[in-house]
Every structure is written in C-alpha cells, then in structure tokens.
Amino acid sequence: MTSEIKKVGVIGAGTMGAGIAGQLANAGVEVVLLDLLNKETGNNRADEAIERMKNAKPTDAFNAGLMIPDNAKNITTGLSNENLDMLADCDWIIETILAPQEIRAGIYQNIEKIAKPDAIFSSNTST
C-alpha cells in the first residue's frame, strides 16, 4: 500500500534542512519548517533560511532551494522549541539538526507524542 506525501515537516533550517524544504516546496508539497531563534538577530532561523533561498542565485549551491521565489508560499515556519504541534498532520517528518544525541532523543520523544500514527519519520543526521 502506498500513501501520498501531502505535507512534510522539516526540523532544522540549516543548509540541509532549508534545501530539503525548498525542494519539496518546488514540487508543490506543503512544508512546515521549524528552527530556533537566531540569538544574534532575534529572528526565526527558518524565516531567515527562506529569505536566503528567495534571494539566492541558481548557481549558489549552498543557498539553493527555491527554483522560483514564489514557491516559498508552500513553506510555513515555526519555532522548534514552541511549535512542534505544527507537525501533527505531517505525513513525513525529517529531522536535520546538529545537536547532541540527548537533545535529538528528547525531540524524537515529543514528536512521537504528536505525530499521526502513520507518519514517516527520518533523520538527515547521525542518530
């Protein structure tokens, strides 16, 4: 049995997480992108990542992600330490954060509490 991936949650808006979110948005998939506040700017890192992708040149491999800046409309942002509930209706949840295993384990436990039973969970980091 196959199921369609309609909504994907990405935790971590660094190079990998933002790039994954951008490519999914390019494909027309609804994306929730979560990260923490940037201590230097006070902005959500996920919002900053979207702005970088919208302004990136197609040849900029480290900031690429959105083929058309308007595809950013497919991405909703939130804070990973406050808005994990935004992942509750995601079909696929991808963790891409660089953090010690203990921190990621805590996030996994919290996701398990709110994720739908048939959600796919994957990690883009060493777990």
Predicted features and spans:
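A short beta-strand-to-loop transition that corresponds to the Sensor-1 phosphate-sensing loop
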Residues: 123-127
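Rossmann-like NAD(P)-binding element
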Residues: 36-48, 52-121
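NAD(P)+-binding Rossmann beta1-loop-alpha1 motif at the extreme N-terminus of oxidoreductases
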Residues: 1-55
